[in-house]
Amino acid sequence: MPKPSPLSLLCSLSLLCAPLAAAELQPKQLAGPPDEFAQMRAPDPAESAILSKSALLQVELAPAGQSARWQGSLPVENGHLRFMVLSGDQAWEAAVAAPQLAGARTAAVATPLQAQRTLLGSAEHGTSGMRYAVDSARNGAWALTLQSSSPVAQRGYVLMEGDTRTQLASYLRTRQQQVGQSLTLNALLTGTIDEASLRVIDPQGGVRSMPMADDGKHDDGAAGDGVYGGTFQPTSEGTWIAQVVVHGHDQAGQPFVRTSEHVVPVVDTSLRLLGNALGARAAAGTRLTIALPVAARGNAPSHYRVFGQVWGTDAKGKDIPVAWIGGMLTPQQGQLPLSLDERWIARAGARAPFTLRSLRIEDPDHYIPLVQAATLPLQVPALRRASISRASTAIDESMRMGPRPTALASAMAMAQPQAAGSQLVLVHGYCSNGVWPQAQFTNASTFLDAKQNRSNDQFAQRTAQFASQWSSFSTVAHSQGGMAALHLYTYYWSGLDNATGGRVMQSVGTPYQGTNLSGVLAAVGSWFGVGCGTNSDMTYDGAKAWLADIPADARAKVNYYTTSFAKTNWYTNDYCNAASDLVLNDPEDGTVEQVNAQLPGGVNRGHTTGQCHTTGMRDPAQYLDANRNAVMNANAAR
């Protein structure tokens, strides 16, 4: 077994080994061809809908003599009663009684429950509770009683699984998540909704509920079309939780309850585009700079994510697409410096008049649109001869990413392959520790930012800081670490751009399209506090908003793997985690569903059963697979 070098061991301990003189990250000047316009559009809200088969129900135990008690009902639709009681550090007892048959004269009798203690989430980011089950349960409303020996008011949640054939779909209509802006959620499903409500938890934990309506007056489409709408207005910045609660009857007439939990980060930031026309000026080489004059108010971020489409006109006066442009931009003297290589214009054969279309300026952590503009006139100077003469050549790195920084190119020129100048960086996930067995990899070091909650942008920058000690590196990443690596490669210059001889980015169990578990944990955490806090980048809509601006050439650099639980037989309810099984759709690894671990445009290296997301689940952790680790090690670029 290869021994890691002393330097690798030292650097695996913390971020402190990153050099103090590490240069500030330089953003790339991104661009791409018109055939990527469709992929780079902002996702339709309905495409990011939460699909929920479960219900997270708030319960409040009231004092009753020498104890506290809550009574309610749980509707069973498919012959199985499965639920989890989440009571924090409070000890509760649960009892259920089956629904009485029509005409029965005897009182309901308590039914024995299968019980097991389990963890919703991970050891670092989760909460424990008791999971109960009745595998042969009569359909109908089961009575549930929760009791505590402490005669004080207490509150918690019951998480219940429903029939997967009836799933609630809900989504935010817009991502205008700013203080004072009204936000509407829509909800619909197969079946009949009898009652729908919106339960909102503010950043301080305050709760209020309001009805949702299908009356055509709540941004819900036409009255009576089955789509319900509910609106709230956030009054402060921070993370809000919006829970849709629906009661109804399925197509077989069975009663059901469903909920969906939306993580809604709200910013106290406004940005205004000054003027309604733009101008480009010639810069070094074949570059053009397009300055976006902006004025910010509130808690403005240090930089923004920007996207826009450049259009021109052909010889017949018809509009023709030129290229998309964007990246992470830092304001300079009140302007955001967009950049375009003139060769895109020459390749398209475009001429004036030009326009910048579909402009989006977003915050860098949640991708909340702060400025949107459909079409802006754009003045472009005459193309230089050098640009015209090189227009027939293939699209190269500088056209897609801008000029490579001199320091990065110099470092690569001086480094020797497989020497101290190159490294494989092992990256953990959200709210995690170093999970990779470093001894199974050669010439490798472990990035460690233990038990932290970072946005993809923050995570990427910390990874780059750690890896700046090497002239080139590649990554093997787990969970959110895979998103951070892709984010780094997309938006910033780093040693990833110098990596050669293999796969630049590899990942296992990364929720590239989000996980429903994020919202459930956020709602539970608003009462009990859970781990590292809420991360919107791993929700369905947050992940898809992030992914919308990740270009095809960056995605193609990712080689990814997925896993799920081992299946014993067709009739057994198998799972990785007994708690998350109530929420996630099969197949899943206890944290992310296989379908949402896919990276469109990435290289899918296969799916393995019998492995779960992390330790403490039923099957071994996916990052401990020595065979796959050997394959990733052998194929990694350096």
Predicted regions located by residue number:
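Lipid deacylating catalytic domains
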Residues: A22, G402-R638
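A short beta-turn/strand-edge loop motif at beta-sheet boundaries
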Residues: D89-A95, R175-V179, L188-S197, A295-V306
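Surface-exposed beta-strand/loop patches in noncatalytic accessory domains
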Residues: K53-A62, D89-S128
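Aromatic sugar-binding surface patches on proteins
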Residues: Q116-Y132, K217-F232, T330-I345
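Short, aromatic- and glycine-rich surface loops/edge beta-strands on solvent-exposed regions
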Residues: Y132-V134, R138-P151, R155-Y157, S236-A252, ...
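Beta-sandwich interaction modules
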Residues: A68-P75, P112-A141, S149-G162
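Flexible, membrane-associating and regulatory peripheral segments of lipid-active enzymes
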Residues: A23, G88-Q90, L120, V179-Q181, ...
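Short, compositionally biased P/S/T/A/G/V-rich stretches that sit at domain boundaries
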Residues: L159-S182, V263-A284
